Structures are given as C-alpha cells and as structure tokens.
C-alpha cells in the first residue's frame, strides 16, 4: 500500500504548490468569515476533483468547518488530520505580498502557518482515496478558526 502512495505524492509537487498558491492568495483573517469560507470552498473543490466525500458544517460567526472522510478497511480507530484555515493577517495583506517563490522558499500570508498543512492533509486524503483507503478511516477536519471557535468543535461530531 505505501509505495504507490509515496510515488504518487512525489509526483504531485507542482499540484501541491498550485493549491498552496490558491490558499495563500485568499485573505482569511480569523474575523473574515467570507475569506475563511473561500479557503474552504477551494478545499472542497479539491475534494470534489478527487472524489473525496466531504461535508460542510455551518458555523454562524466564524468560518464553517469541513469534514472529509476516506474509508477503506474495517478498522474503527479513525486517524484525524486537522488544520485551521484562518490567518492572523489583516484583510488586504494578500494584495501587499501575494504568494511567491524565491530561492526555493515560499512567501505570502500563511505559508509559515497552517496553509501548507492544509495542502499536506488534502493530498494525503487524496492519495489514500486513490489507492483504496487505509485500514482505519482517515478523517480530515478543516476548521475555520484556530483561536476563536474553540467551543464550536463540540458541534462537529
């Protein structure tokens, strides 16, 4: 199971950078629900393109949550891949310093925070889905906000 997944992931670097560029180039301050939800929409488009089952869990004040599940075997111990879609950067930061790569390093709002982790989690889900899943379910939980919605995840089960 592992070798084809690793080979496929190794071939996805350009696609990973493209998804990262898309996510970084969206202003998604914690208090900008529309922007955070736009990051979520880009991720759900990725899940749709890769035929990964997912659902959006609406939250009123901050960004909605997204749950994507890749099943496979009959294991009953889910493996959680999680990350938040917001950044601390104010709306307008993307215009000042959009995603760029220089000397092999990525720059832009969120590249040193969770946005690369969102890309990694999305591609891990895609890889396992493509190759038949994992013995235990893989659950991707993409929350709207790291700090301000801490009571809200109780509603996500």
Where are each of the predicted segments found?
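Active-site catalytic microenvironments for nucleophilic, acid-base chemistry
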Residues: 124-131, 152
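Glycine-/small-residue-rich active-site loops that bind phosphorylated ligands and cofactors
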Residues: 31, 113, 147
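Residues that form or flank phosphate/diphosphate-binding pockets in enzymes
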Residues: 34, 76, 115-116, 150
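Single conserved hydrophobic/aromatic residue that forms the stacking wall/gate
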Residues: 148-157
């Amino acid at each position: 199971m592992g070798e084809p997944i690793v080979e496929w992931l190794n071939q996805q670097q350009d696609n990973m950078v493209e998804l990262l560029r898309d996510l970084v180039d969206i202003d998604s301050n914690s208090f900008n629900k529309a922007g955070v939800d736009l990051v979520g929409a880009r991720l759900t488009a990725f899940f749709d393109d890769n035929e990964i089952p997912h659902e959006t869990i609406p939250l009123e004040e901050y960004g909605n949550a997204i749950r994507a599940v890749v099943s496979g075997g009959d294991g009953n111990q889910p493996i959680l891949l999680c990350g938040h879609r917001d950044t601390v950067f104010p709306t307008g930061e993307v215009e000042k310093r959009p995603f760029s790569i220089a000397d092999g390093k990525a720059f832009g709002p969120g590249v040193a925070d969770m946005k690369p982790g969102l890309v990694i989690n999305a591609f891990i889900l895609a890889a396992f889905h493509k190759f038949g899943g994992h013995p235990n379910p893989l659950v991707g939980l993409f929350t709207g906000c790291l700090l301000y919605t801490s009571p809200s995840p109780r509603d996500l089960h």
